[in-house]
Design a protein with these regions (language model features):
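Structural motif
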Residues: 64-69, 106-114, 153, 159-170, ...
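Repeated scaffold domains used in trafficking and secretory/extracellular systems
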Residues: 43-50, 83-95, 130-147, 186-204, ...
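Beta-propeller fold detector
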Residues: 18-37, 75-83, 119-132, 176-188, ...
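Asp-box/WD-like beta-propeller blade repeats and closely related beta-sheet repeat scaffolds
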Residues: 114-162
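Conserved beta-propeller blade signature
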Residues: 56-60, 97-100, 151-157, 208-213, ...
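Loop/turn-rich, solvent-exposed surfaces of beta-rich toroidal or solenoidal domains
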Residues: 242-269
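Beta-strand-rich domains and repeat architectures in extracellular enzymes and scaffolds
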Residues: 34-63
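Extracellular fibronectin type III
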Residues: 2-17
Length: 269
């Protein structure tokens, strides 16, 4: 005889929360990528930053940039900048455009280049003759889409004393306006060249707040559009041995998140 069975398959979508991230729902995609074996070493004078575009993750050490598969962590080789010199910080916007900055001392020309992908030649997005009296270019951040509406920020820093200021460019319809200097008031202190200060806009709306972190204040500050600190959201647990830096803001499942990286600034303790 013949035995016959009929099966029916139905697809069920797991329940999804309406807002934010559910703790424990994350999955580690890859880990243990040995940068040392790739010749990417931690050393003085390096300026580390990350950007993501398409299926690629870009790691910059300043003058040198390296490509990885963002889904697997596989090393893809060096990033060809096609002759464009951008030895400063790097980031990517909400649309996957990559932004590259150069380092600029006082009175030098500060430039930010943009490319839609790692295959495209970076083109100049904005330039500014550095009249701040300090240096700039180590950290840049962006919210929005630089081909449409966005905000680009760049902290300034000095090796002589401390500063508590950053520059802001409002981009409308892909066109950057003249930069505005924002002086932060209400923070614990300023930062110098070792402070690794970073500031990130909440959105592409210039009236929205910013998030700021740096050594050695070691706190996450909420700063309004005028530069006044309104909240001190998080503080370090290691005191002067902490280093708050690398702020980022993103939207996930209808919720806004601000993230910071906390490391040890010193080798003791």
């Amino acid at each position: 005889g013949v035995t016959k069975r009929v099966y029916s398959v139905s697809k069920e979508i797991p329940p999804k929360i309406k807002y934010g991230w559910r703790a424990g729902s994350e999955t580690e995609v890859w880990q243990n990528v040995s940068l040392d074996k790739l010749g990417i070493v931690n050393a003085g004078g390096k300026i580390y930053s990350l950007a993501a575009s398409g299926n690629k993750l870009v790691l910059s050490t300043g003058a040198d940039k390296f490509l990885f598969n963002r889904a697997t962590g596989d090393f893809l080789g060096t990033h060809d900048m096609k002759g464009v010199a951008a030895d400063g910080g790097m980031t990517s916007d909400d649309a996957g455009n990559i932004l590259y900055a150069n380092l600029a001392n006082p009175n030098a020309e500060f430039k930010v280049y943009a490319a839609a992908s790692t295959d495209e030649m970076p083109a100049e997005l904005l330039s500014y003759t550095n009249a701040t009296g300090a240096s700039m270019g180590k950290h840049i951040s962006v919210q929005g889409n630089v081909k449409g509406d966005a905000i680009v920020t760049a902290v300034i820093y000095t090796w002589n004393g401390a500063v508590c200021k950053f520059l802001r460019w409002v981009i409308t319809g892909g066109v950057p306006a003249k930069p505005q200097m924002i002086s932060v008031t209400g923070a614990t202190a300023g930062w110098n060249g070792n402070g690794h200060a970073d500031v990130e806009a909440y959105s592409a709306n210039p009236d929205d707040p910013y998030f700021l972190a740096y050594y050695s204040a070691n706190a996450l500050y909420r700063v309004d559009a005028t530069g006044a600190v309104t909240h001190k959201i998080a503080t370090a647990t290691w005191g002067a041995n902490s280093n708050y830096n690398c702020v980022d803001v993103c939207t996930f499942n209808n919720a806004k998140y601000a993230a910071i990286y906390e490391s040890q600034h010193l080798t003791k303790g």
